[in-house]
Amino acid sequence: MSPELRWSNRGPGYFFEPALGYHVTQYDLKNAVMGEPSTPTRSLPYGRLDAGLVFERAAGSAGQRTQTLEPRMVYSYVPYRNQDELPIFDTALPDLNLTELFRTNRYVGDDRIGDANQLAVGLTTRLFDHVSGAQYLSATIGQIRYFSIPRVTIPEDILRLESGLPVAGLPLVNPLAWPGLFVTNARAPGSQPFPGQTYATPNCQLGANAPGCQIGVITPGQIGVQYPASDIVSEISLTGYKHLSLDLNYQWNPYTSHTDKEEIEVQYHPDSSRVVNLGYRFQEGILKQYDTSFAWPIGGHWNAVGRWVYSLADRTTIEQIAGFEYKSCCYRIQVVQRRYLRRISGGATAGLDTSIALQLELTGLSSVGKPADTFLQKEIRGYTARDPANREIP
């Protein structure tokens, strides 16, 4: 339960929204660990101030476009509460992006509420058609300034180690002060370790019981200089030029002068039945991938679909998808083959597994077989399912 008192003051060119709330959570655990409470509770207040301005000006040779400049700031305060006795069912720490930048709780899920004393600032500019409202450009840059070091953590990476999975962490940004260690769930502030965060030696990548593996918790005395801010996050979206669009997400650490994350995707989407995607993803110490996909008619009744994901870091194919679709006046049939990399204990790979999905759909009746449309909509950005009569399926 989270009752909240909010005041929304909006007008032409500005908004001002302060909020005060109170989180109250109680668990009713049927199989609690001996010695642990079966009905643990947590209660804590929080405050938030969200404010911004919107400036507009005419753009284009005839003033047919409008450009905006939109500064925004969100101050969040959540006091620290020890939540170690609370279970974790569905809580995780998401990647830092512009959506997460302005959230009060840095965790997804209610099992952990992160303490916060921070100010998120962002600046957005948009360019759109004055008459139709069609957007041509959107660009945003933002950063979080921390006034205190976050203390609430989650043990997800320790659980991965105990399960024999690889360490899901980043190398330390200061290897001279912390030689040979890997810090888990590093994100706030920046990629700098902070007290209460778990760490592991490199041998732990072979398993928690491997010789030389040491797992511990960072104490305040082990931390030197703290980063006062997060990475700088930026997003650029270009649309409206001859069915082409470009999306760029970039995350930069100003203290190490390194790129922590980068995503680029180009899409060609001339109509609802044709789409081609070209993408590149990079995340420091985690992944470096190419991702291409398409859906395209190859005849009056035939359509083809495909996707290929290749890891530059591992020099191997992560996923392959190939399929076809045949449509007539009375029925539609789809066959999709998927090959994907299977990982085993310890992070090793066991080659590519193969699965095949078959779906038959009759006009006016339900489909038979696995829902290939749902799968393709998740795998191919811009893919649109169509029935045998060539009508779009919502």
List PLM regions with ranges.
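Outer-membrane beta-barrel translocator/pore domains, especially the C-terminal barrels
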Residues: 1-311, 315-394
